[in-house]
Amino acid sequence: MILNFIHYKRRSIPIKLYLQKLAHLENLSFVESYDLMECIAENDLTPAQLGSLITSFYHKGPSGEELAAFASLLISKAKHFEIQDSKRIDIVGTGGSARKTFNVSTTTALLLASMGLKVAKHGNRGITSKSGSADLLTNLGININMDMQTCLFAPNIHNALKHVQGVRKELGFKSFFNLLGPLSNPLRPTHQLIGVFSKDYTELLANALKILGVERAMVVHGLD
């Protein structure tokens, strides 16, 4: 399914129809979702349309297929480079747990890398959590703005959603965008471990990872 979209050309989308479907709690198809995210990435929606879209998904809840389509589009627009390792793992969290814990995913990634595993850690600064991966690395004295072969700092790789930040901040609630970071690693990890802020999203993200073609994955949520 994903490979079919490599040379896919977007059509003009009926945004009002999509908003009506979401208002009636109907899921969008993979194609509709892919087209919609491309419209968002190309800044083709008005702030009112974007705000309505985010709010509609907040009430409906995204499907695994919708998330996989969104992530596929973002990966297609991200900066890339060739990688030789046939197996690689990403360990990442969604953030947003409000527990103010240390950055578990990054410390785990460093531990696994020291054991010889090929880790492709994709991360950002903390937005809804106290310490994102980039915050931790910066405090360790690591330059996060190195070339992407050395550091997969999300803002240096994904430029498609910079204009969305203002609307997200004005709305002030978690949205499907909080779930896209862990799914949008441009190196397409073969194995993945994702921590989520709510147990309600474990199966949802697992389904999205399956659609995206990840070979083995675990989506976890702590009970503490």
Question: Where do the PLM segments sit?
Answer:
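Acidic, glycine-rich active-site loops and adjacent beta-strand->loop/helix elements
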Residues: 93-98, 123-129, 155-157, 223-224
